[in-house]
From Swiss-Prot:
Residues the record lists as binding ATP: K198, E315, G341, G342, E343, T344
Organism: Wigglesworthia glossinidia brevipalpis
Pathway: Carbohydrate degradation; glycolysis; pyruvate from D-glyceraldehyde 3-phosphate: step 2/5
Gene Ontology CC annotations of this record: cytosol
GO biological-process terms attached to the record: gluconeogenesis; glycolytic process
Name of protein: Phosphoglycerate kinase
Subunit record text: Monomer.
GO MF: ADP binding; ATP binding; phosphoglycerate kinase activity
Amino acid sequence: MKIIKVTDLNLKDKKVLIRSDLNVPIKNGKIMCNMRIIKSLETINFVIKNEAKCVIVASHLGNPIEEKYDYNFSLTHIVNHMKKIIKYPIRLIQNYLNGFEAKEKEIIVLENVRFNPGERKNDKNLSKKYANLCDILVMDSFGSSHRSESSTTGIIKFAPISCIGLLFLKEIKYLKKALFNSKRPIVTIFGGSKISTKLGVIEKLSNISENVLVGGGIANTILFSKGHNIGKSLHDKNNISKIKKFLYKKNIIIPKDFIVTDNINKFSSYKEKSIKEIKNEDYIVDIGKKSCECFIKIIKKAKTIFWNGPLGLIEIKQFRNGTKEIANSVIHSSAKSIIGGGETVLAMRMFNFIDRFSYISTGGGAFLSFIEKQELPVLSELKKFKKYTNFKQN
């Protein structure tokens, strides 16, 4: 069934709630990467220019404990940043579930939806309260569309009209095109610390990619599954059986050497070792020189590159080199490059490479989930929405 787009609707004099993705990395109150905020503005501006009576923006930020306000997770930081880059008045509201008053042409930002009890559990009553705030719901948060929560899938069931936003639509259109109309060879790069969420998509992309290059916790888990000593390195013992499904695929390339340390901090000394040289007290924190050379050789031949997750511990400067070297080879290749995931985007911003990729997705888990299944819980709900399937502009 066709999904209603925000461009299909007459927004004039309507209360419009936009579920955006403003979940950005913040350190000591400072926004480290504002990409998601910037990309969300297209839909917000579209709604304002089409004369909505009230523009309401909702988002989550991080993983606070439900029912407990925590300033570190407050959207105060986001709103203060938005005030600098948008010309309309913006106001943050903390208590909004029972309604509120808004001035004309004012943007209302709702405080972190994850402060609300029941949000993560997709509570029906909470979903209804969100829906009661608007005439039209615009689902624009691609980054959280793989989650079934009250402000994602739940609200769609109860909003008078539910539609898809401009950013969300761009994401799925681009990723579909990249998946099904990509030039070959296709090379996929996987790293990062989140392992279990990537196993399905690794298997999927290993079937359509000429090569899959892995680092980080995923490489460690594969090495551990093969019986290698990885010392104290990050790995996922709970998913060994799933890893074994693609353990010996010839197109999955794991590092041959590593940067290791016996103490993880910014003053740590480190050594380069082969897998056979790793000791019980070692932590693998980056890929080594030989692995970089091997990966770069493969990347040079690629025509399409998918990338999710850094290859080393990028939080510490001396363990970023592997990720930086590989990123440098990607941006200087002739390949179309598609990256996704918060850590990946943050790393590229650190290296000042952020504008050098063909496409940067705002999704991490959603990016992976859509690549794996070409479907998302939020998309499924939007397809079910039948109340106004014949609703026309004006």
